[in-house]
Regions:
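Conserved ABC transporter NBD signature motif
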Residues: 76-84
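Catalytic Walker B motif of ABC-type/P-loop ATPase nucleotide-binding domains
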Residues: 178-181
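Helix-to-loop junction immediately C-terminal to a conserved catalytic motif
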Residues: 68
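Conserved ABC ATPase signature
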Residues: 153-157, 161-163
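Short coil-to-helix segment of the ABC ATPase nucleotide-binding domain corresponding to the Q-loop/switch region
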Residues: 113-120
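A short, proline-enriched helix->beta-strand linker immediately N-terminal to the Walker B motif
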Residues: 172-176
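ABC ATPase NBD coupling module
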Residues: 85-101, 130, 202-204, 246-249
């Protein structure tokens, strides 16, 4: 079920002093070949963990690119931590992005720098002192299980280890918002579990985490909030949701049909059995 503008206003009224970390209000993005996002409205509160799900082309990546100001909306309002992104000039976009953590499917590591230096770079570009770098980098490497790899270069690491470096770099500044676009897309199931556990630990520190993913098993396992998109529209916004909205499966329905029908104890109306079969 999509979030309506009335839902947004109700949430704001319930928490008047805590603006949402992310707010989309009637946001649309039109491309030359169609709508990437169509009249989308939702909010994400401080400390939430949210999955964006949907098929390829559903609008997940458009949401992520809008959030980092890689794209501008055709219409509507986007706010991050209460700040209207339309007010951020192109010159100030790099400064805005430094307050976000972003994890990509393809890692985007600096190939000629070690694990330590890849993570330290995220601090250096924000003006952190050498003392801060020396204090923060070892801590984040311990959190991400990379303490023994700090002198390795990216080509000496497995895919899962490279993604851990990407997560460490995104989180070393302790951003209020971390965005992960298909973070397990190139990883095997066991490694994917490790990455999602890491993102969950980060979320437990208070950072809001939004993950765009096709990993249905992971979404079903974690049971966090799910926002589902289809053809640019939000079609479901569910707390503790599954990857796909769960109806009775074909197998379950087949089992139901194989059960012997009980003797009726009252006059049945047409369709009663089907009503009960699909009732929660």
């Amino acid at each position: 079920m999509a979030t309506t503008e009335a839902d947004i206003l109700a949430r704001e009224a319930a928490h008047p002093t805590a603006p949402p970390v992310v707010e989309f209000r009637r946001v649309s993005k039109r491309y030359d070949n169609g709508m990437g996002l169509d009249d989308a409205s939702f909010t994400v509160g401080r400390g939430e963990f949210v999955f964006l799900v949907g098929s390829t082309g559903s609008g997940k990546s458009t949401v992520m690119r809008l959030l980092i100001k890689e794209l501008e909306p055709t219409s509507g309002t986007i706010r991050v931590a209460g700040r209207d992104l339309a007010e951020i000039t192109r010159k100030k976009v790099p400064f805005f992005r430094r307050n976000l953590g972003v994890v990509f499917q393809d890692y985007k590591l600096l190939p000629n720098r070690t694990v330590h230096d890849n993570v330290a770079y995220a601090l250096q570009v924000t003006g952190s002192s050498r003392k801060e770098v020396r204090a923060k980098v070892p801590d984040i490497l311990r959190l991400t299980g990379l303490s023994t790899k700090l002198h390795h270069f990216p080509d000496q690491l497995s895919g899962g280890e490279q993604q851990r470096v990407s997560v460490a770099r995104a989180f070393v500044n302790h951003p209020p918002l971390l965005l992960a676009d298909e973070p397990t897309g190139n990883l095997d199931p066991e490694t994917s579990i490790g990455i999602m556990q890491l993102l969950y630990r980060i979320n437990r520190t208070g950072t809001t985490v939004i993950v765009a993913t096709h990993d249905s098993a992971m979404v079903d396992r974690m049971r966090r909030r799910v926002i589902e998109l289809s053809r640019g529209r939000i079609i479901r916004d569910e707390v503790s949701g599954l990857y796909a909205q769960r109806d009775m499966s074909t197998a379950e329905f087949g089992e139901l049909l194989r059960e012997p029908a009980p003797e009726p104890r009252r006059v049945r109306e047409p369709g009663d059995e089907f009503d009960e079969a699909f009732r929660d």
